[in-house]
Amino acid sequence: MADADRNLNATETRGMSDIARADSREAATSGPLAGLRVLDLTSVVLGPLATQILGDYGADIIKVETLEGDLMRANGVSLHAGMSSVFLAINRNKRSLALDLKSLDGAAVLKRLIAGVDVLVHNMRVSAIDRLGFGYAAVAALKPDIVYCAATGFGQDGPDRDKPAFDDVIQAACGLASLNSLGRETPEYFPSLIADKTTGMALVNAVLAALLYRARTGQGQYVEVPMFETMVAFTLAEHLGGLTFEPSPTGAGYARLLKGGRKPAPTLDGHIAVLPYTGEHWSAFFKAAGRPDLAEKYGVADRQARNANIAAMYGDMAEMTRQRTTAEWLNICAKLDIPATSIVALDALPDHPHLQAVGLFQAAQHPSEGAIRYVNPPTRFAATPAKVRLPAPLLGQHTREILLEAGYEEKEISSLQVRRVVTQSG
């Protein structure tokens, strides 16, 4: 993080929280999932983002890490080894247990923990977790009502079930990289871990649905959330297009989104995102731009005519927006109730007036990293607020605490540490 980025704004620091001194055992006492305990065997992005959301909602998340730690501890900007910006962003509201799961004693520790949790989440290949002895059948034998969620790359009923999967691979496989090649010579990845993050949110929904079923019936179940299938469903929600019908009148794709002119429009001093969507929007925009005749030329009152002429309309709009500044167009669009915004850079988001007003960003003191900025949970609950109670943990920060809760004696914990079955930081 650059020095300039360390300067937290006044809105953030006004309510600066000292999560560094939060008591981890008492912290998870609010939120709609308060009292729920989750055993988190995930790493990298998909699983950790999902379990962080559950933690934001009040669940007690026990993050089980290898003795080397989650891979994302080393990816991103870092002030200190093992605490990267990405790790800090997707691992708050968790307690860390560093455990050698491949050892017999480590497996015994996990078995004891399973007896006291409601949910187990992992993102290993199913064959790998089966070899460790913690496939669904083995875990359900220890805890019959557990909600067991496997985040996989590919569904286990298909021929690709054992293939490795990362975000780039899934973006390519699900059609996103192809979609993102419009106007370019080669396919390109979207510059965000969109497959990981989208599948992570799907995982949250799946876990909550399974928990609701358990609350009604008392029965746990196996839940699978495959990245590939999730992202194909995500991509085709609007892009299934002509493939919806048999025989297909056209190919896949939502035409309006695939036109080359669908991009931020140039202005005198930059660019603007403007979306005249209805016929009324387009008529008002053309009139404001001094070309009311174009509304009749393109037949904007008719949806089919708008769709047929959308590329030409985007082209004319881009020429018109060049004639005024971004601020002028924002003012015009606001008066006409046409959706529009300036182009906001990532670095400018913490100072965005709306985000400051709703308190999306928050300053906090981290036990090892000092003053940090985090993004608050965006979802609002009137009676059971989601909030940040714990900072992202150091590797093995809560090992002793978690083992004591599981019924281990101090001498047993010391023995596990000496034999490097577990490690404890701090």
Label each region the model flagged.
Residues 188-198, 220-222, 252-253, 260-262, ...:
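A short glycine-threonine-serine/GTX helix/turn-capping micro-motif
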Residues 211-250:
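Substrate-binding/catalytic subdomain of NAD(P)-dependent oxidoreductase enzymes
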Residues 335-389:
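A glycine-rich dinucleotide-binding beta-alpha-beta segment and adjacent secondary-structure elements
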Residues 193-208, 227-235, 277, 281:
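Mid-domain beta-loop-alpha active-site segment that forms a flexible
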Residues 68, 153-155, 227-232, 269-271, ...:
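Glycine-rich beta-alpha junction loops
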Residues 255-256, 260-336, 340:
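Aromatic-enriched alpha-helical interface/lid elements that frame and gate functional surfaces
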Residues 2-216, 242, 316, 394, ...:
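N-terminal helix-loop segment corresponding to the beta1-alpha1 unit
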Residues 87, 252-257, 262-264, 309, ...:
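Short Gly/Pro-enriched turn/cap motifs at secondary-structure boundaries
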